Amino acid sequence: MKGTPSFGKRNKKNHIRCRRCGRNAYNPTKKYCASCGFGRSKRLRRYSWQNKKPVTGKRLK
């Protein structure tokens, strides 16, 4: 089921506040932060697709 009654069962916290980045993205069961990667790696989790790239080489009419 996926309707309104099923949403009443969603009441437990999957993420808590992260020690490193402070965002509410640390998963205590998997023991890693979905935002900064704390618990998985020593380096900060960041990807090139997170930021929009400036438009270059586009022809203007």
Curated annotation (Swiss-Prot):
Signal peptide: none annotated. Binds 1 zinc ion per subunit. Keywords: Metal-binding, Ribonucleoprotein, Ribosomal protein, RNA-binding, rRNA-binding, Zinc, Zinc-finger. InterPro entries: Ribosomal_eL37 (IPR001569), Ribosomal_eL37/eL43 (IPR011331), Ribosomal_eL37_CS (IPR018267), Ribosomal_zn-bd (IPR011332). Zn(2+) binds at C18, C21, C33, C36. It comes from the Archaea. One of its GO terms (biological process) is translation. Its cofactor is Zn(2+). Binds to the 23S rRNA. Belongs to the eukaryotic ribosomal protein eL37 family. This is Large ribosomal subunit protein eL37. The gene is rpl37e.
